[in-house]
Every structure is written in C-alpha cells, then in structure tokens.
Amino acid sequence: PHKVMFGWFGNWTGVTMSSSLCGLPDSVDFVSLWLCWGNLTAEQQTDLRKFQEKGSKAVLCWRAGDIGDNLTPGGNATDVKNAFWGIDPNDEDTYIEAAKKYALAIVDTCNKYNVDGFDYDIEDNGTLISSEHPERANTFMRTLREEFNKTGKILVADIPGGKSWLRFYDILAEDVVQSLDYIAWQTYELGHSGLDDFFTGYGGVSSYHPEIFEEVLKKSIVTATFERAIDKHYFSEQQDYHPSCGIEHGGMGAYHIEYDYPGNPDYPTVRAAISAQNPPINN
C-alpha cells in the first residue's frame, strides 16, 4: 500500500515559494497548517486552492487543552473561554455541550475556507483533555467526525512520540480512534529500534486499545523534526522503517517541513524520502 508523506507546515504566507504549499513536492499527500486557525489571507486562499488542485490536502492544526482554545473572541484566558462557550464549572453537561460547540466552530472554519479537515494536537491537559472527564474530548472528536463525513474531510490526531504521552491516547475511546484517518506520532528522535519499542515494546502503543492495534499502526504516521538541524537525520532513517511486528505503518512526516525548502532541487530531504518510502515497482 502507498505510504503517505505528511508535514506540519509553519510560517505559511503563500507569498514566496518557500512559504507556499505549492512549493512542496507534488507527492506530499497532506499537510497540517501549524498554528493556523482561520482568517486566511487572499494569498493563502489562492495557494491552498492550487495545492488542492494538485491532489494534496491541508488541514488546520493546533494544540487545545481547553475548550475554545484559539477560537474564543477576547483571548485564551480561562474565564473568558468559559463565559463565551457557556461553561459552568459545577455542571458537567455544560462542558459536553461546549465541546460540541467548539467542534462545530472548527467545522465552520474548515467549510468557510475550504480547508480539508483538522489535526488535533493532543499534548495539554485542560477543560477539553482530561483523564477524569474523557467524554469531553470524545464528544468533541465524534462531533468533528460526524460533520466531516458530510463533506469528505479528514480527522487526524497527533500525539507526542514517547510512552509517557500515551496517557493522552488512552483518553480517546476506541470508536474515536477507529474514526481517525491518521494518527501522527511526534517520534522526533527515534530510529528503527526506537520506533519498534514505541509501538510494540513494553508500555507502548500496542498496550492501549490492543484489539485495534493493527488498524492503528496501518494509519500511524511516524515523524521527525526539521526545527533542529541536529535531529534531521532521523527523518532519513525513518524513510526505510518497516515495523518488526510485520504490519506496515501509514507513512512518515516532518515537523516544520518547510525548513527543507532550500536546496537544488528544493526539498531535497523530503524528495529522497518520498522515493525511498514508495520505491518504483519493477515488473
């Protein structure tokens, strides 16, 4: 099966090739627009449209520990968010309703700008992500899935790639995990053996939702970071990773994929990985 190439794209303006989605190699399947929560400029809208015409997708992406993060008029202060989304700290039902409203606001933004979906970066505790109240995050995700199904949009979760962070994965209900199109794991400093240990070692991904582990691995994207040059080699190591358990993963990606633009040709590291990950079939 085809393995996807993915990236978190930051510093997006759509003005220069290095800050445009259209500057990416054609074989990049989808990107998460890192820290983009709507309000697209004319240049961004044009760039997005051309990128989609090439067959690629782009989704919104941000961290949201709390209900309302980044979409609350007046800012991210807790009392401001609670007031706007109708949360009464003494009434759990108001959290569930607010989680639905927050999901619908994200859907509205995706529809308004013709963005292809949402990548939920799960690494903060708060009023939305809480092991004491898992129903909040699960209601949020189920609402997104239900609405995205109407328009063919994609839903992605991204979670840090260390075993201690799997507590966030554990909050997600099995049906929610099954409903995800992809899970992007932030496995920034892991080579082959580290990835194997993360997925199938003691306390790894396979220890959670074990009944659906095969399905999860098939849609799991392993990633490295281009933010720190010293860690970039992990990306090239991950391009020929094959899980030792014998189940193939979904693909690979990079945090700040746009940092690989400089080169001749441009995106040299990404292009090499695209070829290595899906080698040409010789008949």
PLM feature segments, named:
Residues 2-233, 247-249, 253, 258, ...:
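Chitinase-like catalytic core of GlcNAc-active glycosidases
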Residues 201, 261-283:
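C-terminal helical cap(s) of enzyme catalytic domains, especially alpha/beta-barrels
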Residues 237-244:
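Short, surface-exposed beta-strand/loop micro-motifs that present aromatic residues
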